[in-house]
Regions:
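Conserved switch/coupling elements of ABC/ABC-like ATPase nucleotide-binding domains
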Residues: 227-231
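ABC family nucleotide-binding domain
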Residues: 5-225
């Protein structure tokens, strides 16, 4: 794996938050390099800064100090508009609580990133191809018969698979998953991990946060966060 190029690199990441009169240092110089096609699990206890670090990796938050490089480019030096494009087109996010829109169908939820990334004219011109891709993703995820359903009509595992389809809609180079099985029973969570393994075998780069070391072992490499540092 080390012979493949590094697509994401974190260098000496620091992050703190203020709680009343106290400043809490969450990350104290975290380093990480993720190679193309790698499946990395970041594991640590509750409050160790795992989710904070993942959000910084994906451009959802900025560090107090340190650099996040994507293909060698420092995201801290990127403006807000370009950072939005980066998050929409090059990174896919999967969260513990799905964040699906109940008023939209399963298919429409998966289509959302494609709709957001295009102008009205561009969307009208390309919606047929986008719909075909969304339907293909749902088919691969075992949801062919659910495309017209609303999220509230689905099981937890089905909703998480919809969220994965949405994350993959724009063919991101990097998939970031924050406790993707944390809201699921063990059998359903295992099914989601099987999906991640299949995606990774097809070349998808994945960074997953979990508090469960058993889940982390499904990844190719595990990074432990403790006392604000990576081990």
């Amino acid at each position: 794996m080390s012979q493949l190029p590094v697509i994401l690199k974190a260098e000496s990441i620091h992050k703190s938050y203020r709680m009343g009169a106290t400043r809490v240092n969450v990350l104290k110089g975290v380093d990480l390099a993720v190679h193309e096609g790698e499946f990395v699990a970041i594991v640590g206890a509750s409050g160790s800064g795992k989710s904070t670090f993942l959000h910084i990796l994906g451009g959802l938050d900025r560090p107090d100090k340190g650099a996040i490089q994507f293909h060698g480019r420092d995201l801290n030096r990127v403006g807000a508009r370009e950072l939005n494009r980066f998050r929409n087109k090059r990174v896919g996010f999967v969260f513990q609580f799905y964040h699906l829109l109940d008023e939209l169908s399963v298919l429409e939820n998966v289509l959302l990133p494609a709709m957001v990334s295009r102008s009205i004219v561009g969307w009208l011109a390309g919606r047929g191809a986008a719909r075909k891709r969304a339907e293909g993703l749902l088919d691969q995820l075992g949801l062919r018969e659910r495309t017209g359903h609303k999220p509230y009509q689905l099981s937890g595992g089905e909703r998480q698979r919809v969220a994965i389809g949405r994350a993959l809609m724009n063919q991101p180079e990097l998939l970031l998953a924050d406790e993707p099985t944390g809201n699921l029973d063990s059998a359903t969570g295992n099914g989601i991990l099987n999906v991640f393994e299949t995606l990774n075998k097809a070349g998808q780069t994945i960074v997953m946060v979990t508090h469960d070391e058993r889940i982390a072992r499904r990844a190719q490499r595990t990074v432990m966060l403790a006392d604000g540092r990576a081990r």
